[in-house]
Regions:
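Alpha/beta enzyme core
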Residues: 2-21, 31-146, 152-153, 157-169
Length: 169
């Protein structure tokens, strides 16, 4: 579109931002797009991302399917990057705190350096955030991060309750 080389841009940012960790969002087996890619393509993209300046790769799958995260997690660990595994927060009869805690434990066992609650729709309510963070903190040893949106106007209070519950980032 702009005729730019994204790796050049990343290296330029890294040259000017020396003491700050750079993070990218990575859609698991879909990399940055909306279709699946072969394992070797995922591995090479992770390698190039870290080699060009990315420190933290936040990897997620919209379906919370760990199978779609394994290659990216393994590749990030191989390249000595920090792999933050995110789960997509939603609400339903099966998407409860026990479900998310089990998922977080599985991500930790797969090699996650940190876990992110990815509240991409802004659905997480303040007291639900408190309970979820407490459950996660008792289930995993790695740091927990909250990423939320202001869609429902609750983000500041949700963040406050998550802090009170001990969220790390």
């Amino acid at each position: 579109f702009l005729g730019e080389d994204p790796w050049d841009r990343l290296r330029t940012i890294r040259d000017h931002v020396k003491n700050t960790k750079l993070q990218m969002l990575f859609r698991g087996q879909n990399i940055l797009g909306y279709r699946h890619y072969a394992d070797d393509v995922v591995e090479y993209f992770v390698q190039k991302s870290i080699a060009n300046g990315i420190d933290i790769i936040r990897v997620f799958d919209a379906l919370n399917d760990p199978r779609n995260l394994k290659t990216a997690i393994d590749a990030t660990k191989k390249e000595k990057g920090h792999v933050q595994v995110a789960f997509s927060y939603t609400t339903s009869p099966v998407h409860n705190n026990e479900y998310f805690a089990t998922l977080a434990k599985q991500f930790e066992e797969m090699g996650a350096d940190s876990i992110c609650i990815k509240d991409m729709s802004g659905l997480l309510k303040p007291y639900d955030a408190y309970d979820l963070v407490k459950e996660l903190k008792s289930s995993v040893k790695v740091p927990i991060e909250l990423h939320t949106h202001y869609t429902a106007g609750l983000a500041s209070m949700t963040t406050l309750k998550a802090i009170e519950a001990g969220v790390d980032i």
